[in-house]
Each structure stands twice: as structure tokens, then as C-alpha cells.
Amino acid sequence: MEYVNLYTRQHENSLYELKNKGVIQNKRLYVGLHMKDISDFFLEKYDYFVKMASQIVAKPDEISYPIWCSVSKDNCLKPIHKEVVYAMTVPKSEVIYFDGAKWDLVLNNQYVPLDKDDEKRFEKELKSRGAGHSFNIFDRKYDEMYDDIREKIVASWDRIFEITDRSEFVVQANLWQIKE
């Protein structure tokens, strides 16, 4: 079995969970507490991520959300007050790798292009339809007006798992849980 090193910053209470339960699992409540007033927006995207990631590494039934990790200790969030950093060696088969730059596109309701030519084709399509920028496509005032484009955007999101830039600053990783 092949192993890889991952790093993640978590709340200090996770130490208690790891000691007493033997695992750390991310929960909807934790996302809400961490993201505060923008949690609904992130939870919608995280739900979609879970759906996609489950196709790559099977999600245990009791898990709600994955745990975000860095593939590099240099690129991992540094410890701050009431937070700890875990350095882990885990089976590679349990890791969900994805492109963090492409994930940022998903967070902004953007199209994830196959390449530069695909990006130009998509922008040309938006312009020809009078949509301007795809930021607008998900506005409620455009409901039903651009359904086909919205579907095309959402269908492109699984490309976050197609990693073309292997830089430690681009590649991110998720685990369904951290085991003791």
C-alpha cells in the first residue's frame, strides 16, 4: 500500500475528538461555526463537492463533509490561537486530490474550462447570448433565462479532479476522516 503525507489545520477541540472517538470527522455544524454568516453559500458548494468526491473515494455513511488538507507543510495553514496542525501519513487510496484553483471557480459559480480554447468558446457563447459574465448566470433574476448555460457550468465542475498543474500550491487534498 502506498502512503502520502498530508497536513491540515483544525480547531483544538479536534484533539479531544481524536483521543475519545479515535477519529475526526467534519460536520455541518463545524462548517457553520467556521464560515459563520456565509456558511449557507459554502454548504451548498460543499454538498456538491461531497457528491462529486464520493465518486472518487467512497464516503462512509456517517460522514457529512470531508476534511480539507494540504499536500505540503509549506502551503498548509499555519497554527493560530485555538487551532492545531496535524501532519499525517495516510493511505493514498483514501485521498481525494483536486485542483484548488479550479475549486475557486466552483465557489464563484464559474465555468471550469478544459483548456484555454474551451474557455474562449464558453466566453464567446456567453457574449452571443447577452449574458456578459457567468457571475450573472446564477442570479435569481435570470432564472429560466440561462438554464442551459447554468447546467453547462455545473457539469464542468467535476473537472476540479482533473489536475494539470501539480504544484503544491494548486493541488489540494481531502480525507473523509482523520483516524488515530
Question: What is each PLM-predicted segment?
Answer:
Residues 72:
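Divalent-cation-assisted or electrostatically stabilized phosphate/pyrophosphate-binding catalytic cores
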Residues 37-62:
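Short alpha-helix boundary/capping and kink motifs at helix termini
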